[in-house]
């Protein structure tokens, strides 16, 4: 029953995301399109080039984020374990900040894949430190404390690194840390679906 309600909510949110925007696509127009009737060229472009890729990316990656949190809580037997509490997110942001400030600052071209790999490396490294600290005291209850400590250390180093950054790099880092689904394409949806499918 609960899963059915969640699926209905997800479907409703997807429809709202598709219909609402600077150009409104009426809900009846979506249903007519499903039945085989054609939309206008503008509505078709907005639907298939902008809103559908964005909505599907949000659904796939949002589900992956929820699943990762559930797996962390299950693995560590702690209901409050998560990427923010364990310092994983802070470690990822630190390495991305280093790449943006010191590589982009030197006019080195950095691809999205490089930022993703650097974030993964930082998350993996910070999680390793947390596990080592928790193992040293031999108490899983110290895992959360260790994660919070690592998170604050990474955040402090990130703030220090940002002081050397150009204004444009600070804006880029802030935009990356906040996250956005604008500009998502069908190729991004395919990559996200493949990666999440393999990881799951």
Stretches with model-predicted labels:
Residues 1-200:
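Alpha-helical transmembrane segments in inner-membrane proteins
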């Amino acid at each position: 029953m609960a899963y059915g309600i969640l699926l209905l909510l997800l479907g409703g949110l997807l429809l709202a995301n598709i219909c609402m925007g600077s150009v409104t696509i009426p809900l009846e127009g979506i249903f007519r399109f499903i039945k085989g009737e054609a939309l206008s060229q503008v509505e078709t472009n907005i639907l298939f080039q902008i809103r559908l890729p964005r909505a599907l990316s949000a659904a796939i990656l949002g589900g992956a984020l929820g699943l990762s949190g559930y797996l962390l809580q299950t693995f560590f037997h702690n209901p409050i374990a998560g990427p923010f509490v364990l310092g994983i997110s802070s470690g990822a942001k630190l390495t991305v900040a280093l790449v943006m400030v010191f590589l982009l600052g030197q006019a080195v071209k950095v691809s999205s894949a490089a930022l993703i790999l650097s974030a993964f490396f930082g998350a993996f490294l910070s999680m390793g430190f947390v596990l080592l600290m928790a193992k040293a005291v031999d108490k899983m209850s110290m895992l959360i404390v260790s994660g919070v400590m690592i998170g604050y250390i990474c955040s402090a180093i990130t703030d220090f690194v940002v002081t050397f950054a150009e204004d444009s790099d600070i804006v880029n880092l802030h935009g990356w840390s906040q996250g956005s689904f604008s500009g998502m394409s069908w190729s991004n949806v395919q990559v996200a679906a493949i990666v999440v499918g393999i990881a799951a």
